[in-house]
């Protein structure tokens, strides 16, 4: 099947097509090209667009017809997860090891499955230096065993990836971030593509048109100051 796809011209452009122009097959594919500059990535996320492509492909930009999202105030950890965390030696931090989280999200996936290639890693680390990319870390004593990272767009957190090296680590990262995010007036966590794992954690489906409306509203509003200041979100290591 031949697909006609427009290209970002010039490659450093921050002007994207309207997301309603995305293809139906493959679902959500909008445009190709670009350079993953910080300005380009920030503009993309502000318009509900994210990069996702495989090694050897051009940069592909997506906005699927249905998003996976969390409303953090509705996130409810199971009793078993609460009990597990209470009895564990885990502790949870925010923005204490963002580079490590990005690296581990890439390296812990099978090579043929990962889209987090070296140029993506470098791009999101640059966004971290600019204060846009943030991470949640789960530790067992001094070992980093799980976490997630994503971008701050107003009152939305755009989740990029998560990893887990020990039982429940990524679930606990998400739970503790939801608690924190709500307390600082965060409203929505965008998971991009829905999948069974996210659904099992409580993610909801949202149509692209509804997401676009909510994005236009929430991207211009701010969380409470110091939301992303490096800090401890939960600590059982001394209990």
From Swiss-Prot:
One Gene Ontology biological process: protein catabolic process
Enzyme Commission number(s) from the entry: 2.3.2.6
Entry keyword Cytoplasm: yes
Subcellular location: Cytoplasm
InterPro entries recorded: Acyl_CoA_acyltransferase, Leu/Phe-tRNA_Trfase, Leu/Phe-tRNA_Trfase_C, Leu/Phe-tRNA_Trfase_N
GO molecular function: leucyl-tRNA--protein transferase activity
Keyword Transferase: yes
Chief localisation class: cytoplasm
Catalysed reaction equations from the record: N-terminal L-lysyl-[protein] + L-leucyl-tRNA(Leu) = N-terminal L-leucyl-L-lysyl-[protein] + tRNA(Leu) + H(+); N-terminal L-arginyl-[protein] + L-leucyl-tRNA(Leu) = N-terminal L-leucyl-L-arginyl-[protein] + tRNA(Leu) + H(+); L-phenylalanyl-tRNA(Phe) + an N-terminal L-alpha-aminoacyl-[protein] = an N-terminal L-phenylalanyl-L-alpha-aminoacyl-[protein] + tRNA(Phe)
Gene3D superfamilies: Leucyl/phenylalanyl-tRNA-protein transferase, C-terminal domain, Leucyl/phenylalanyl-tRNA-protein transferase, N-terminal domain
Keywords assigned: Acyltransferase, Cytoplasm, Transferase
One Pfam short name: Leu_Phe_trans
GO cellular component: a single term: cytoplasm
Family per record: Belongs to the L/F-transferase family.
HAMAP family membership: Leu_Phe_trans
Job of this protein: Functions in the N-end rule pathway of protein degradation where it conjugates Leu, Phe and, less efficiently, Met from aminoacyl-tRNAs to the N-termini of proteins containing an N-terminal arginine or lysine.
Designated name of the protein: Leucyl/phenylalanyl-tRNA--protein transferase
Gene for this chain: aat
């Amino acid at each position: 099947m031949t697909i006609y796809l427009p290209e970002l011209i010039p490659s450093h452009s921050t002007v994207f097509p309207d997301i309603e122009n995305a293809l139906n097959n493959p679902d959500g594919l909008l445009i190709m090209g670009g350079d993953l500059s910080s300005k380009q990535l920030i503009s993309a996320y502000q318009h509900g667009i994210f990069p996702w492509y495989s090694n050897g492909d051009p940069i592909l930009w997506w906005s699927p017809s249905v998003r996976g999202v969390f409303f953090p105030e509705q996130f409810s950890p199971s009793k078993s997860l609460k009990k597990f965390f209470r009895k564990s030696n885990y502790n949870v931090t925010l923005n204490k090891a963002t580079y490590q989280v990005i690296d581990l999200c890439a390296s812990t996936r099978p090579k043929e499955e990962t889209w987090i290639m070296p140029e993506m890693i470098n791009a999101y680390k640059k966004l971290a230096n600019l204060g846009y990319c943030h991470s949640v870390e789960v530790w067992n004593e001094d070992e980093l065993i799980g976490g997630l990272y994503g971008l701050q767009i107003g009152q939305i957190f755009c989740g990029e990836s998560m990893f887990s090296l020990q039982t429940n680590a990524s679930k606990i990262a998400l739970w503790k971030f939801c608690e924190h995010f709500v307390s600082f007036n965060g409203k929505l966590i965008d998971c991009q593509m829905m999948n069974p794992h996210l659904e099992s954690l409580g993610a909801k489906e949202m149509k692209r048109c509804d997401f676009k409306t909510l994005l236009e509203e929430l991207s211009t509003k701010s969380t409470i100051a110091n939301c992303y200041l490096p800090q401890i979100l939960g600590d059982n290591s001394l209990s």
